[in-house]
Amino acid sequence: MSQQTTASSEYLDESKTFSSFQLDLRLQQSLKSSGFHHPTLIQSSAIPLALEQKRDIIAKASTGSGKTLAYLIPVVQTILEHKSTQGADRTTGTLGVVLVPTRELAQQVRVVLEKLVLYCSKDIRLLNISANVDDSVLGPLLAENPEIIISTPSQLVKILEGKHLQTISLRDLRFLVIDEVDLILTFGYQEDLLKISQYLPLKKNLQAFLMSATLNEEIQELKTKFCRSPAILKLNDDEINKNKNKLLQYYVKVSEFDKFLLCYVIFKLSLIKGKTIIFVNTIDRGYRLKLVLEQFGIRSCILNSELPLNSRQHIVDEFNKNVYQLLIATDDNEYIEEEDEETVEAGEEGSEKLEEGGEKLEEITSKTSSTNGKQKIAKKDKEYGASRGVDFQNVSCVLNFDLPTTAKSYVHRIGRTARAGKSGTAISFVVPLKEYGKHKPSMLVTAKKDEKILARVIKQQSKLGFQIEPYNFDVKQIEGFRYRMEDGFRAVTQVAVREARVKELKQELLASEKLKRHFEENPHDLDSLRHDKELHPARVQQHLKRVPDYLLPEAARETGKKIGFVPFHNPKKNRKGKVAKRKPGRKSDPLKNFK
């Protein structure tokens, strides 16, 4: 969910205001304080259906269209009405559960919800249980029976099946929200959702919200399980995207080693203005790139699934505040064994089947390509996600240092830029098959299928009305930097990468756990905690940090402009620059020379 202050004007419904929905005055005040005046298109459609007709909602809308408030406003409004009618006999159970695929998204929903209940926090308490919290701490928090619980499916199942079953109460549950449904299914949470359904009062007028960026036939099972005659809303963001078309997409065919060379040239010469996210496919790959860039004095910060949740959230927050300009993000949650090309062309067949069992009340929209494939979930923290859902703001460029393994992942990655009506650039490095495996130290297994994946991506994007063009540059201009990259890359060994990985993890664990309470009491001290410090586990060659003028193009050379006329010879000065001294003669006896 994007704030309205950063949302594109194409998404706003200026014919309505939030007062049109007859919301609680406290909600209207909090919305006004946050800068929200007009609802977005998806909000103006979903809120009346949820509040007045009590319909289940299945909504398809892209990131930044206001999906989060589209379900939070009806949930909070109904809970406030429920509490006001009950009076002294207020229920003590949890009334709403919000399920999200990653812990980062859970944190974002918590922040939005806290702002929404700013003036009614005594009536509505919320709890984010997505993070791993000690049982001695979690028990008392659940015993307070918060009105709204935010969690990932796996964490909620863990609590329901554990010793906290008697502590948490879902018997009075009124709302179930499943946000980013397509991503939840991609991460393999189907079994967790079925387990959760056993603890829900599905036959007691439970209102469900299924929010997603795409609708496919996989959602049909969830629709049958949780919804009763839902209202299906589709936002016409394809027309919006075609109108603005501010995302420029390029690909560069380079060898494995030249990926590092191009990165060095691009960021050392500041060829990209603004903030950049670099996506890599493995954690080691991210640290290797960071260490190589450090050899040339280029600072960056790392975001991956090994880091603690608090550190990951702080990195995202600081990146959004423009503290860092370069973020290296590991996108290692999805590994695809084989992707069927027919699924890339499937289009909206899944959403058509979905609409058969429900009433399609409003179609603000369009056709969106969806991809499905045989998936193998990586054994990492599957509740981490950088390429999807995380609210990165004002990103100028997305650089796919390693091409993703599917066309679907490509769409998720480039979706981090050109958001809310702003322009952006996506650049992808592609390794030709003939270049694969020639440079073993920089080799990556997934690069073997780069050309095959690129063909699918181009085909998919062309169906959506976008073009991916080859990025042409003069190879001779960067050849002068090659010997410097070879020196810098040679210093970053596998041992150095492993040491950097351990050192970074130790630093972040210390900052995340031991200093957590201190930072809560002293929030200003948190500003001094940086994540882009140099790790220095490799041998750093200081001369590589400076680019000599002879490597720069003539337009970028400034030495000749600053230095004035320097004469070849100055006869007034001694050639050595100082007066010559006479050599002392033979030492004389001071007693004989005394007068």
Curated annotation (Swiss-Prot):
In which residue ranges is the amino acid composition biased (Acidic residues)? 340-349
Q: Where is this motif: Q motif?
A: 16-44
Q: What is the protein named?
A: ATP-dependent RNA helicase DBP9
Comp. bias regions, Basic residues: 570-585
Q: Where is the Helicase ATP-binding domain?
A: 48-233
User: Where in this protein would one find the motif DEAD box, according to its record?
Assistant: 179-182
Q: What is its EC number?
A: 3.6.4.13
Residues covered by region (Disordered): 340-376, 562-595
Query: Which Gene Ontology cellular-component terms appear in the entry?
Result: nucleolus
Q: Could you give the domain comment from the record?
A: The Q motif is unique to and characteristic of the DEAD box family of RNA helicases and controls ATP binding and hydrolysis.
Where along the chain is composition biased (Basic and acidic residues)? 350-365, 586-595
Detail which positions bind ATP.
Answer: 61-68
- Source species: Eremothecium gossypii (strain ATCC 10895 / CBS 109.51 / FGSC 9923 / NRRL Y-1056) (Yeast)
Family membership: Belongs to the DEAD box helicase family. DDX56/DBP9 subfamily.
Q: Name one GO biological process term.
A: maturation of LSU-rRNA from tricistronic rRNA transcript (SSU-rRNA, 5.8S rRNA, LSU-rRNA)
The protein's role, per its UniProt record: ATP-binding RNA helicase involved in the biogenesis of 60S ribosomal subunits and is required for the normal formation of 25S and 5.8S rRNAs.
Q: Which domain of life is it from?
A: Eukaryota
What GO molecular function annotations does the UniProt record carry, in alphabetical order? Answer: ATP binding; ATP hydrolysis activity; DNA helicase activity; DNA/RNA helicase activity; RNA binding; RNA helicase activity
Ordered alphabetically, the record's keywords are:
ATP-binding, Helicase, Hydrolase, Nucleotide-binding, Nucleus, Ribosome biogenesis, RNA-binding, rRNA processing
**What SUPFAM superfamilies has UniProt attached to this entry?**
P-loop containing nucleoside triphosphate hydrolases (SSF52540)
Q: Which InterPro entries match?
A: DEAD/DEAH_box_helicase_dom (IPR011545), DEAD_box_RNA_helicase (IPR050079), Helicase_ATP-bd (IPR014001), Helicase_C-like (IPR001650), P-loop_NTPase (IPR027417), RNA_helicase_DEAD_Q_motif (IPR014014)
Show where the Helicase C-terminal domain sits: 246-479
User: What is catalysed by this protein?
Assistant: ATP + H2O = ADP + phosphate + H(+)
